[in-house]
Amino acid sequence: MARVAGVNIPDNKHTVIALTAIYGIGRTRAQKICEATGVKPDMKIRDLTEEEVEKLRAAVGQFPVEGDLRREVSMNIKRLMDLGCYRGLRHRRGLPLRGQRTRTNARTRKGPRRPIRK
């Protein structure tokens, strides 16, 4: 298994698919990385040379991925909550942020039903 950005990426998958195992890299970004480094997207990770893996590491290193990206996202959410804006309040209360109805739906965001106590 090749190790890129602190993640073991699977050997038996094509390069484009294997790169998506890294948090912050989806299909489109993985294709752009392969294009920029000159690595064939349909080549398996185990068939890559060490030089090609190094190119991939360098290309992935230019983007915020894994821990840095997770920290950035959580800091953005925390900032919204500290500001006290509408989105921050919705985050704090665990409700949907983008205008969805909450009277009947939104079970995923609100969690399981709690019985009404008398």
Curated annotation (Swiss-Prot):
GO terms for molecular function: rRNA binding; structural constituent of ribosome; tRNA binding. One of its GO terms (cellular component) is small ribosomal subunit. Pfam families: Ribosomal_S13. Residues 94-118 are annotated as: Disordered. The keyword Ribonucleoprotein applies. SUPFAM superfamilies: S13-like H2TH domain. One of its GO terms (biological process) is translation. PROSITE patterns: RIBOSOMAL_S13_1, RIBOSOMAL_S13_2. Belongs to the universal ribosomal protein uS13 family. NCBIfam families: uS13_bact. Part of the 30S ribosomal subunit. Forms a loose heterodimer with protein S19. Forms two bridges to the 50S subunit in the 70S ribosome. This is Small ribosomal subunit protein uS13. It comes from Thioalkalivibrio sulfidiphilus (strain HL-EbGR7). The lineage of its organism: Bacteria, Pseudomonadati, Pseudomonadota, Gammaproteobacteria, Chromatiales. The gene is rpsM.
